[in-house]
Design a protein with these regions (language model features):
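Catalytic machinery of carbohydrate-active enzymes
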Residues: 1-207
């Protein structure tokens, strides 16, 4: 059984939100699954050591429609790529007709998808209800990042123990998700007053 999960939302945060459902699908079918995601989901980094994920396929779409999978021709390009992999089952975490068409053109016989054309929804609630209905089991919303223990131990040994090391994920995929920089500064000052700390900023050049 070859299973594909299509998760087209952008950003690391959204990718992590969907992890419990990807893991649940993998456990249900007792096989690692492949995922179709956008590059800025950072799935290649987040899931590098995740045994529930077999292959990470990048969906190249952009806001200005310049990605190789954008437009009508992009539908055929990505469906051709997927068809080569001979998937038996797909879970589509999106209500777009586009991804239904892609799955059908890819020759995937069993398709589970959000209700077509649904746009406004709660990302966590919708994913949870959809997955639980499809798998007929309760799924926790708590995400788990599977990390290589040796890598973690080696990294930990390189840090001084004289103070706490705090990583701040200040990046966001949209303006409604951003927290003002003044809030981060106030938070760091408050933490540092209680516990001497060193802060690391996880963000891009434009954040």
């Amino acid at each position: 059984m070859k299973v594909l999960v299509i998760q087209p939302k952008i950003g690391m945060g959204d990718m992590i939100i969907y992890l419990p459902y990807i893991h649940a699908i993998s456990k249900r079918y007792q096989t690692p699954v492949s995922i179709l995601v956008k590059k800025n989901s950072r799935a290649n980094q987040l899931l590098a050591d995740d045994g529930h994920v077999d292959e990470i396929i990048i969906l190249d779409r952009s806001k200005n429609d310049t990605g190789i999978h954008d437009g009508f021709s992009g539908v055929f390009k990505i469906s051709k790529e997927l068809k080569k992999r001979h998937f038996n089952k797909v879970f589509i975490y999106n209500g777009s007709l586009r991804y239904l068409l892609i799955s059908k053109l890819a020759g995937i016989k069993s398709i589970s998808q959000y209700p077509l054309f649904r746009k406004k929804d709660n990302i966590v609630t919708s994913a949870k209800i959809f997955t639980e209905n499809e798998l007929n089991t309760i799924v926790s919303t708590q995400p788990i990042l599977h990390l290589n223990k040796e890598k973690v131990d080696n990294l930990r040994n390189n840090f001084t123990q004289n103070f706490k090391h705090v990583c701040l994920g200040i990046s966001a995929s949209g303006p409604t998700k951003r927290w003002d920089i003044k809030n981060f500064i106030k938070l760091c000052e408050s933490i540092n007053e209680k516990i001497p700390s060193k802060f690391y900023l996880a963000a891009g050049n434009n954040d």
